[in-house]
Amino acid sequence: MDYKLIVPVNKVDGSKIETVTIKESFTGRDIKAIGNAKGDGDSMIALVVVASGLTENNVLGMDARDVRAIADLARPFLIGGEG
């Protein structure tokens, strides 16, 4: 599933990320990465990292509305359903 960012992310190399492809299937590694997060904020960032394939640094630079939207779109797939 593709998601168009509200605010594009500027990468260190000067390029921009404007669209993110959200995974619709997760692995045990993904569950572990999210489960090992320290709190609600960390777990939301971890979810967006595994769902998007972006680096944590890229996700930390995202607009909060985009982080929240991607997490909300990915969560149903993570728990076994569809959005």
Place the predicted regions along the sequence by residue.
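Short, surface-exposed, charged amphipathic helix/loop patches that serve as local interaction elements
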Residues: 1-83
